[in-house]
Every structure is written in structure tokens, then in C-alpha cells.
Amino acid sequence: MAGAGTLPGRAAAEARRRGWRVAAFAFEDAPGLAEAADEFIPSSITDIQAVLVGLAAHRVQAAVFVGKFWKSSAFSKYDQADAAGLGLAQGGLSDAALSQMVVATLAGMSIEVLDQREFLAPWLLPAGTLGARAPVAAEWDEIREGFRLAGRLAADGVGQTVVRARGVTVALEAAEGTDETIRRGGRLAGPGAVVVKAVAASHDYRFDIPTVGAATLEAMREGGATALAVPAGRVLLLDRDEVVRLADQAGIAVVSVDDAG
């Protein structure tokens, strides 16, 4: 079940390498997916019935949701009758309500929804410093406080990213996503901001896998941010070589931290 980006193609290739037969239902543009899958099925989130018929026709036994799904634009096309038919009338369009609806619908077809890490583990960022520079003492102070705040933010289901500078929290992530939060924080703080991304202990990796990549570093460079910290083993790193190049070029410290919460 493929959203936008390169992750669906990577997951499909890894699944096939491990002996799975892959039927890719593509809801967004996912470069490389058609070549990586055994079957490629263009799909629309506004035509759920066709997707369910396709799942049955391909005798799907397990599903993995990978990539970016544009929930706000897609589900705005549903009317109240559609929402009620999908079981959303009570739960609304929150991530939790959508996840519960999907799991229940697929369970009724004897389809298990798998953790994305099943096929994306090779790209999880291990503990350590990435690139030439480690954080300095002042940046570590911001990182420790950032993890405390971002952990609470993530646990409440609000967002995962905090931007701090000179002892002050300047931006918290909500619906806009990590990169836009970084840009907003950079505009408010000016050069020298520290970015921290946390993951809730109860995070459901079946439907979302926190990710950083070259776009994250570009957003940091635009605003003059100087350090990025993420929890070890819980966040995907895309475009590793490009991330290292950008970090070293801009003097940005990138660190993955054990016991970050």
C-alpha cells in the first residue's frame, strides 16, 4: 500500500529479496515501485471499494503501508455518507481513527497489517555521530531538553519535532511536518538553532515511520540550524551520502542518541 516517495520501492525490493510476492497498490507517485513489485496496481484512496476488490483478487495475506499519504486532501473528498460507510463517523479523521478503521477492515479479509520496519530496517539510523562534527556542549544542552519536550509532544500525538535556540523553544511540530517546522524555527530563531526529533514509546510503525533525509538538512541549512538529534534505531535515514555531504558542507552536527526516550 504505497504512498509518495522512494520508501515504497525500497520496501518492495526488500520484500521480494526475502521471498515475498509483492502486489503494489500505488496511491501516490512512488519512483521505482513499478520496477520493484511483481504487480503494480494504480489506486485511489477515494475508491476504497476497488482497492478491496483488488486485494481479494490478488489473494493478499499481509499488507504494509509505506510512503507519504496525503490524508487531508484525499479525505476531504468524502461526504458524510462515505465517512459513515468507512466507520469514520464516530472516530473522525484522526490518525488513530483511520488506523483502527484500516486494521479492522483488512482483518475482516484475513489480511494482517505489518510493521514497516519489517522491510525498512536496513535504513534505521544506529547510535552515533553522522558526518565530521559532533554536537558541542551548548548544543547537547538543547538536545537533552529538546528530547524531553519532543517526547511529550510525540506521546500526545501532536508532532515529533522541536526546534530550540539559546535555551528557548522556538517551534513545535503539528500538522505541517518536520521540514516545515524546521523552516519556521529557523525564521524565528535565526542562525544557531538545534533540531530534535523524538518518537513516542507507543508509536505505531504500521502506519508511520519517522524519517530524516537530505530535505531535512536542506531545511536546516536554509535557516542556519547547527545540530540535528534523533533517537537511535527508531528513525529512518534516507540519502545517507547526501545527508553527510550537506551536513559537513554546512557544519551541521547530526547525532543519533541511545536512551533518548
Where are these regions (language model features)?
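Conserved mixed alpha/beta catalytic, RNA-binding, or beta-rich assembly cores of soluble enzyme
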Residues: 1, 15, 116-217
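N-terminal basic/disordered segments at the start of proteins
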Residues: 1-27
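Feature captures the catalytic cores and cofactor-binding loops of soluble hydro-lyases/lyases
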Residues: 27-53, 57-58, 77-87, 180-261
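General beta-strand structural signal in soluble alpha/beta enzymes
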Residues: 2, 23-25, 63-66, 95, ...
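N-terminal glycine-rich "phosphate-gripper" loop used for MgATP/nucleotide binding
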Residues: 45, 61, 65-73, 210
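Conserved active-site and cofactor/substrate-binding residues in soluble primary-metabolism enzymes
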Residues: 2, 6-10, 43-50, 58, ...
